């Protein structure tokens, strides 16, 4: 029964920070990288391909991680510099110190990842919740986004209920 309760807790609340550290040591091998953003979030990312190639940034959906893109990334690397990362409380990124999980916080993390990597322009691809994050990022940073690709993107929240 304890095992079932522990699994349910992890599914609902995500892993504890200590659990994430163990997972990072076991699964965070190259080409994985970890960067600490100015807000204290430790982001797990992969930056693959040649630095002079056009950049494509892949943003996964809710309850996914950067491995969602493994098959696609395999085909893109060689023609593109492929950036993918785990959103906060997903994959090996773990929980955020501020315990904030709004779309705005995810967009802010995306902005900081882009800045940290020194990327000027790129194509942005978002799936599910990652699509919503990508749309909001693009609206706020049009000068950086050369193209936006949405795959089964979640919609924007409604201010009024549908009758």
Set out the residue ranges of the language-model regions.
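Flexible "cap/lid" loop of the alpha/beta hydrolase fold
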Residues: 135-140, 146-163
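Conserved catalytic-core motifs of eukaryotic protein kinase domains, centered on the activation segment
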Residues: 68-70, 93-99, 159-161
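Conserved HGGG/HGGXW glycine-rich cap/lid loop of the alpha/beta-hydrolase fold
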Residues: 41, 47-92
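Active-site loop/oxyanion-hole signature of alpha/beta-hydrolase fold enzymes
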Residues: 33, 38-39, 46, 87-125
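Gly/Ala-rich beta-loop-alpha elbow adjacent to hydrolase catalytic centers
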Residues: 126, 130, 134
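A conserved amphipathic alpha-helix that caps or lines the catalytic cleft of carbohydrate-
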Residues: 73, 114, 137-138
């Amino acid at each position: 029964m304890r095992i079932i309760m522990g699994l349910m807790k992890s599914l609902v609340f995500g892993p504890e920070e200590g659990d994430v550290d163990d997972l990072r040591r076991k699964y965070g091998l190259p080409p994985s990288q970890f960067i600490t953003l100015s807000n204290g979030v430790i982001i797990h990312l992969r930056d693959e391909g040649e630095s002079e190639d056009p950049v494509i940034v892949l943003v996964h959906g809710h309850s996914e991680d950067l491995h969602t893109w493994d098959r696609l990334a395999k085909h893109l690397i060689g023609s593109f510099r492929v950036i993918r990362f785990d959103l906060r409380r997903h994959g090996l990124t773990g929980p955020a110190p501020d315990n904030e999980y709004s779309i705005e916080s995810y967009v802010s993390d995306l902005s900081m990842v882009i800045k940290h990597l020194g990327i000027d322009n790129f194509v942005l691809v978002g799936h599910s919740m990652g699509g919503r994050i990508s749309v909001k990022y693009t609206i706020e940073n049009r000068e950086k986004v050369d193209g936006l690709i949405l795959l089964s993107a979640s919609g924007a929240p409604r201010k009024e209920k549908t009758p």
